[in-house]
Amino acid sequence: MSKSPVILHLRAETKPLEARAALTPSTTKQLLDAGFEIYVEESSQSTFDIKEYEAVGAKIVPEGSWKTAPKERIIFGLKELPENETFPLIHEHIQFAHCYKDQAGWQDVLKRFPQGNGILYDLEFLENDQGRRVAAFGFYAGFAGAAIGVLDWSFKQLNGNTKGTKGEGEGGELPGVTPYPNENELIKDVKIELEKALTKNGGQYPKCLVIGALGRCGSGAIDLFKKIGIPDDNIAKWDMAETAKGGPFQEIVDSDIFINCIYLSKPIPPFINKEILNNENRKLTTIVDVSADTTNPHNPIPVYEIATVFNEPTVEVKLDKGPKLSVCSIDHLPSLLPREASEFFAKDLMPSLLELPNRDTSPVWVRAKQLFDKHVARLDKE
């Protein structure tokens, strides 16, 4: 007797300016061809047109209809569900939930699953037999983060870098950014702003420091820097060997742009703190915390407290000395290039999705379920 087909329900993303999709039209077709049933919600913010899904044979349903969908559907999305919703979750969910690393409010996020006998397969923790993530947005997170870093540095060169309040001319923060249709358009815009800044400052390129340079995210940041023409000598590429001695690091203070791309898996000494930054001779004016462990008690960049958003991409670090310093801590940076990031991610995820009919025995899914059970058990204790 053959198994019933896996039924996936692609929910519409609700996070503001989240234009990515967990399934693309091309990966939807692959799954349909493999015998899956797929429902796709209409979405007001997806980079993909609903007609693209319809054309490959998906069933189109209204936005938000997953809440009343039959229990046998697996609800598939990317970002977390809205915080103001608290009803129990009855389905199996595949998504990034951000509740396994003691983030603020993790219990409230996680408890909804056992309350409804639902299951969470967290995309961040789908790992192969070697312990590596099967799919990640890291490359485009680093790429987009570096782009915003250069835009912010250029903005400061052009508009002055004195401290002030938002919107008061000099001292204002970087204006909002919106998703780009493709990588080339983003590169073009960043190059234009960089060239203006170089004209103003006598052709001095920024000194950039990337921590986590050997990973997906760091390689994305370095790729952006190279594609817009920043000389290789101006890009310091740090990884675990360089940070082994423990921070804070004066080398960050002496750079113009600092990009943090590490994956935080355990407590480490901070890379920087307000004491080392509060210096008249500081060069650093732009931090991009791609890792965005904003609410993690072990955040290695403990100089800001909010996650920024695309329409207000930076927040000022309050310091008494030195030039103005801003942090970008957007936690869904790949949305700046939603189509390419979605295709890249979905392609990597495809072999694991094709294993969903065997999720009770397939190692990737079994490990994800065991991790879910482990953290649910913590709910009772904490």
UniProtKB/Swiss-Prot annotation:
E.C. code: 1.5.1.7
Alphabetical list of InterPro entries matching this protein: AASS, AlaDH/PNT_N, AlaDH/PNT_NAD(H)-bd, Lys1, NAD(P)-bd_dom_sf
A single BP term in Gene Ontology: lysine biosynthetic process via aminoadipic acid
Keywords from the UniProt entry: Amino-acid biosynthesis, Disulfide bond, Lysine biosynthesis, NAD, Oxidoreductase
Main enzyme class: oxidoreductase
Family as reported in the entry's similarity comment: Belongs to the AlaDH/PNT family.
Function: Catalyzes the NAD(+)-dependent cleavage of saccharopine to L-lysine and 2-oxoglutarate, the final step in the alpha-aminoadipate (AAA) pathway for lysin biosynthesis.
Annotated protein name in UniProt: Saccharopine dehydrogenase [NAD(+), L-lysine-forming]
